[in-house]
From Swiss-Prot:
It comes from Bos taurus. Residues 1-60, 166-194 are annotated as: Disordered. The keyword Phosphoprotein applies. Residues 40-58 have a biased composition (Low complexity). Disulfide bonds: none annotated. The keyword Coiled coil applies. SUPFAM superfamilies: Sec2 N-terminal region. Guanine nucleotide exchange factor (GEF) which may activate RAB3A, a GTPase that regulates synaptic vesicle exocytosis. Promotes the exchange of GDP to GTP, converting inactive GDP-bound Rab proteins into their active GTP-bound form. May also activate RAB8A and RAB8B. The lineage of its organism: Eukaryota, Metazoa, Chordata, Craniata, Vertebrata. Residues 184-194 have a biased composition (Basic residues). This is Guanine nucleotide exchange factor for Rab-3A. Keywords: Coiled coil, Guanine-nucleotide releasing factor, Phosphoprotein, Protein transport, Transport.
């Protein structure tokens, strides 16, 4: 390979050498200078460029500074405008939030008032319902007591009717059927006619019954009648009223004052609350002390009397009835005398309850005489007078 420079002796022509040519500065022609707009000549222009270089640089820097400041001012103005807009929007939003807060508070207050009124109305309805229920229960209780009393009376009337049939008349209920020896007084107990008439002009017990004459003298006690009229204006079962306080003291208390004081108090409370029940019982269900197993042939289903102990008086006698206090399952057997005393008091309370409820449509005087008759029954029952049972 070939390397290096060629030599002249190898047949090649010698290299050309650079010949220095002197340069002459030639100025532009006149026409060219005119076309350039009267620019200075080249040497003068170069001198001007050399002198104006730092000034141009300072001019550029000042221009940059002025443009930068202008940009900053515009940016500051823009930011101020944006800040003003944001503050304005924020103020509007604050006002809207405040308005919504007021609306929410108003709604909460209205909701609270509505809830309170609803609860108050609900409590009022519940209270009225409870009062109506209590009144209904009280009326139901009283109605049941009346029904029980009427059933007991119906049972007693049925017993009287059955034992007074033509085939088997009840001679004790019809004294005219008794023989003269049975109907008359016992020997050794005869009284003078005038003395007997003077001692009992109104009632005379014959064969276990009270016979009332057809005509009786009546006279209204003004004090008692005034107390009754004052009670009748506003009838109540409160024992503090003068009328009921007198009846309790003179009739109800003594009539229900039995030997067994504790049970007597319970019976009195049950009678006042109208929760006492009197039930007739067959003799075979009684706790027998002395049992007479011979059937007497009665058509009412009772056997011969069975002796037992009265729970109120403590006496051993034939107990055809028993009492139950309230909802208790316990029963207490009572004698006919105790039953008559309890029944007399129950009849009195039933009548004054009818007056209290407005069921008695009478004037004051007939009502007063009916109450006087019921008080008379309590007094007689306390003294031991009662209808003899079949």
């Amino acid at each position: 390979m070939w390397s290096g420079q060629p030599h002249p002796d190898e047949g090649h022509p010698p290299p050309l050498e650079a010949v220095p040519v002197p340069w002459k500065s030639v100025g532009p022609c006149k026409s060219h200078r005119e076309s350039l707009g009267g620019l200075p000549e080249t040497p003068a222009g170069e001198e001007a460029q050399g002198e104006e270089g730092p000034a141009a640089t300072q001019l550029d820097v000042s221009r940059l500074r002025s443009s930068s400041m202008e940009i900053r001012e515009k940016g500051s103005e823009f930011l101020k405008e944006e800040l003003h807009k944001a503050q304005k929007e924020l103020k509007l939003k604050d006002e809207e939030c405040e308005r919504l807060s007021k609306v929410r508070e108003q709604l909460e207050q209205e909701l609270e008032e509505l809830t309170a009124s609803l609860f108050e109305e609900a409590h009022k309805m519940v209270r009225e319902a409870n009062m109506k229920q209590a009144a209904s229960e009280k009326q139901l209780k009283e109605a049941r007591g009346k029904i029980d009393m009427l059933q007991a009376e119906v049972t007693a009337l049925k017993t009287l009717v059955i034992t007074s049939t033509p085939a088997s008349p009840n001679r004790e209920l019809h004294p005219q059927l008794l023989s003269p020896t049975k109907a008359g007084p016992r020997k050794g107990h005869l009284r003078h006619k005038s003395t007997s008439s003077a001692l009992c002009p109104a009632v005379c017990p014959v064969a276990g019954h009270i016979l009332t004459p057809d005509k009786e003298g009546k006279e209204v006690d003004t004090t008692l009648f005034a107390e009754f009229q004052a009670w009748r204006e506003s009838p109540t079962l409160d024992k503090t009223s003068p009328f009921l306080e007198r009846v309790y003291r003179e009739d109800v208390g003594p009539c229900l004052d039995f030997t067994m004081q504790e049970l007597s108090a319970l019976v009195r409370a049950a009678v006042e609350d109208n929760t006492l029940t009197i039930e007739p019982v067959a003799s075979q269900t009684l706790p027998a002390v002395k049992v007479a197993a011979v059937d007497c042939g009665h058509t009412n289903g009772f056997r011969a009397p069975i002796d037992t102990t009265c729970a109120l008086s403590g006496l051993a006698c034939a107990c055809r009835h028993r009492i139950r206090l309230g909802d208790s399952e316990s029963h207490y057997y009572i004698s006919p005398s105790s039953r008559a005393r309890i029944t007399a008091v129950c009849n009195f309370f039933t009548y004054i309850r009818y007056i209290q409820q407005g069921l008695v449509r009478q004037d004051a005087e007939p009502m007063f005489w009916e109450i006087t008759r019921l008080r008379k029954e309590m007094s007689l029952a306390k003294l031991g007078f009662f209808p003899h049972e079949a």
